[in-house]
Every structure is written in C-alpha cells, then in structure tokens.
C-alpha cells in the first residue's frame, strides 16, 4: 500500500559503513556509533549504521531517481546510546523511505499532503487486516490531525512533551506534530532532531516555522 502510494522502489540497506565517509547518520549529534576494525582493510574502522538518512539520499542520486519517486528499505541498526524503554531498544529493525522532491515542494502544505497519503495507506492496511481477521475492529479516525509543537505546548503547558503527545492522541486518535526540533516559547525543544537533515524551520502559510 505505502510503496504504491508514494511510488517507492525497494533497495537493500547496508549493515555498516566505513568510518569517516560521512555516510553514517549523526542522529541528534551526540550518539556514539558502534565501531569495529576490518582486518583485510588494514584494520580500517567500520561503523554499524545508526540510521540511513544520508545513505538514502546518496542512493537516490546514484539511481538518478526522478522527483515524485523514491526508495524504501529495511534498516537493521544498533544504537548504543538509546534510552531504553518498552518502545526503544539497542537493536533497531526499521522500515525507512526517502523520496525526491523539487525545491518548490519544500512547503508545509506539501508535507501535509504526503502525510495524508501515508495515512490513507495506513487506513487501507487497517481495512485489509480487519477483513482478513474478523475479530479485529477498525479504530483509526478517518482523518489525521495536524498540530504545531508550540500549539501543543500552549494547550498543555504543565505536561511533558510525551504527555502532550499522549493527550492530543487521546483527543484526536491520529496526530502529526510539526515543528519538532526547534525551541519553543519555554526555551526547550519538543524533542531532539538531527541538525544535519531534519527541517523544523520552513515557514508555513500561517507564518509559523
């Protein structure tokens, strides 16, 4: 559903890359990659991937993917500095995708259009799962709700970012939070994002970053 909706081609992801090439992702800029020497390369250091943000963009260029098309892959990573809980572990098995856009597409309205297409694919998947397993009942709302991290802070000023997310999701069922990574009115970020490739400063039509 998702690969068809977004016009994505499957590619195989690396488990590790050579250190110093700038391919491995820095995540929030402080996480340490797992490294090991490769004997037949003169003990050159390799790094287990953190994520594939940079690699995916190199792959798009290598395959000369046209705007409106992209790639998806199954990433296996180790994150030694991950804060462990019931949702996060040292080992990451994550489906990842990236698509080519034009300079003119770098707008909040385009972002929200892509999110709606992704959510539509999720709804179709939910429908198919419920058809295949009648004991399941659909629970997702028909539409996804968009909200800026600053508006979320204004709504729930006494809650932590995670508690705000829980509260807004209980209210709307499916939510996309914008502006993550930039400082809010309380001087804090909603959450950490990569300074290398994440964009939290594109101006929306309503004037918000």
Language-model features, listed with the residues they occupy:
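Structured aminoacyl-transfer and RNA-binding surfaces used for tRNA recognition/handling
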Residues: 1-209
């Amino acid at each position: 559903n998702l690969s068809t909706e977004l016009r994505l081609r499957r590619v195989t992801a690396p488990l590790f890359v050579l250190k110093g090439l700038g391919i491995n992702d820095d995540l929030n800029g402080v996480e340490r990659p797992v490294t090991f020497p490769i004997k037949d390369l003169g003990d050159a250091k390799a790094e287990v991937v953190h994520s594939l943000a940079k690699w995916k963009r190199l792959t798009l260029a290598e395959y000369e993917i046209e705007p409106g098309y992209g790639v998806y892959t199954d990433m296996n990573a180790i994150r030694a500095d991950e804060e462990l809980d019931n949702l996060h572990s040292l080992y990451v098995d994550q489906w990842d995708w990236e698509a080519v856009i034009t300079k003119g597409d770098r707008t909040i309205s385009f972002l929200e259009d892509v999110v709606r297409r992704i959510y539509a694919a999720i709804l179709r998947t939910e429908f198919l799962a419920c058809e295949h397993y009648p004991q399941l009942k659909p629970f997702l709302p028909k539409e996804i709700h968009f909200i800026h991290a600053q508006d979320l802070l204004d709504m729930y000023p006494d809650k932590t970012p995670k508690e705000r997310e829980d509260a807004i999701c209980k209210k709307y069922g499916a939510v996309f939070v914008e502006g993550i990574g930039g400082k809010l009115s309380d001087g804090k970020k909603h959450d950490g994002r990569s300074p290398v490739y994440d964009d939290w400063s594109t101006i929306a039509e309503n004037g918000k970053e």
